[in-house]
Each structure stands twice: as C-alpha cells, then as structure tokens.
Amino acid sequence: MFDLSDQLITMGLWSISIGAFGAAVAGILLANTDFFLSQTEKATLDYLEETELKTIGEEPRLFKAKDLWERDGAVIMAVRRPGCFLCREEASGLSTLKPQLDQLGVPLYAIVKENIGNEVEHFQPYFNGKVFLDAKGQFYGPQKRKMMLLGLVRLGVWQNFRRAWKGGFEGNLEGEGLILGGMFVIGSGKQGILLEHREKEFGDKANLTAVLDAARKISKQTAQNDN
C-alpha cells in the first residue's frame, strides 16, 4: 500500500510539473504573438502640430512642432531612449538616408522625451540631424505604449538585441526606456502624415525603403505647390 501511495504521489507531481511546463510554453508562445501588445492609436496632424518642443543647447527656446514640417515636410524619429543601443542602431540606419533626403529637400529630425546629462550629446554621433525635446511626450501618444517584462520573452526582441550587438552598437541604462517610440514622415503644410511607424517591441525599426518612398511624396507635393 505504501509503494502504491508513493507511486500516486510521484505521478501527481509529474502531472503538475508537465502541466506547469506546458502552461509556461503556451505563455511564451502567446507572448510572441501581438495579442498582449499595447494597442496603437494613430496620431493626427492636428494633434502633433501643436506639440510644444524645445531646442537642446545653451539657449533653449520653445516652438510649435509644426514649424519642423510646415514648409518642406520632415522625417521625424521619436527616440525611445537616447542611451539605448537599439535606438542608436536605428538612428544610424536612418541617417544613411540623409544624402537622399537632402536631395529631396526634406529635413531629418529626432525627438526625445527627456534630456538627462549628456545623453543627447552622446546620441548625436549616431544621428545626422537636429534633436529636440518633447517634454510632454506628445510624439509618443496619443496613447503611450509601454513594453515591460513581456520584452524579455519575445523572440523578436532577442533577435534585435543580437543584430545590434553584432553591429557593434553599445549603450547604457540611463533614462526612461519603457515607453515605445516610432517614426513619422509628415508632409508640408496640411498634406498630413504620410507614414507612421509605431515601435511594437524593443528594436522594431521602420522600413527605410518605406520612409524614403514617403519622403518622395513630400517632394512631389512641394513641387506641385510651387507651380
């Protein structure tokens, strides 16, 4: 009878272990779908253009965000965290478009939500454009999205980590890095938002071909307006 009880207990423990393992595997698989990702609310031109931005430097000044794109349109990166090596990788890749954007007459900008120490200064070598402060985080809304522990079990995040590490990018942990960033291509005047990419997980970059294609639409619209 004693042996039978031991066997039943052992079988019960095995069943619990297998069940727990199965639940963990199912949880990881589910976490790698988009089911648990923060929902995205698209920004509108009216929402973005009244955003108050600040220059970063010795004599900071405030201005409305629409000044960035009103005449020539703009490509704008909303940086999750300047010290993040994934953000530095994305900024470096985006900067490769600078010669083509210059030919189109489209400026390249970056937005940060905080200015801590020398973080923006250390970010600047990776980004070939001006950087401005959005202290209220408007460019990260209207509905700010966060990624927390979920990021540690997503395969895509680890693949992004590996890609950036192999690329030789380094970073630090200074500042807030859970609110996800994004990318905008905004047309001149009231042309509107031509491309909006919202980072769905750490290191989820905008497609550079799509960014350049959207920027080319600004050039055509500007030419039509001049005529």
Curated annotation (Swiss-Prot):
UniProt GO MF annotations: antioxidant activity
User: Which Pfam families does the entry link to?
Assistant: AhpC-TSA_2
Cross-referenced InterPro entries: PXL2A/B/C
Compartment(s) where it occurs, according to its Swiss-Prot or TrEMBL record:
Cytoplasm
- Keyword Cytoplasm set for record: yes
Q: Which GO terms describe its cellular component?
A: cytoplasm
Active site residues according to the UniProt entry: 84, 87
Q: Which UniProt keywords apply?
A: Antioxidant, Cytoplasm, Redox-active center
Region span, Thioredoxin fold: 13-111
Domain of life, per UniProt, equals: Eukaryota
What is this protein's function? Answer: Involved in redox regulation of the cell. Acts as an antioxidant.
Q: Which family does it belong to?
A: Belongs to the peroxiredoxin-like PRXL2 family. PRXL2A subfamily.
The miscellaneous comment for this protein is: The active site cysteines correspond to the redox-active cysteines of peroxiredoxins.
Listed name of the protein: Peroxiredoxin-like 2A
